[in-house]
Amino acid sequence: MSTIWVVLIAIAALVAGVALGFFIARKYMMSYLKKNPPINEQMLRTLMMQMGQKPSQKKINQMMRAMNNQSGKE
């Protein structure tokens, strides 16, 4: 009878650990994305205007493609 209890407690601890780990990881990722949002076209356009460049759609698309290619290699 005690072996069954050990197995049940081990399974319960495993399930609780997985659930707790999921929620901790989810909270961490949400706070990380809130602090460091991914760059979109509007942010890139604003950045180029602040640097004194005229942001054409061709330049925006080129830079977005370059950033996506760079992030895909990592």
Swiss-Prot record:
It comes from the Bacteria. It is a single-pass membrane protein. It is found in: Membrane. It holds the Pfam family UPF0154. The chain crosses the membrane at residues 4-24. GO terms for cellular component: plasma membrane. NCBIfam families: PRK01844.1 (NF002503). HAMAP family: UPF0154. Belongs to the UPF0154 family. This is UPF0154 protein OB1676. The lineage of its organism: Bacteria, Bacillati, Bacillota, Bacilli, Bacillales.
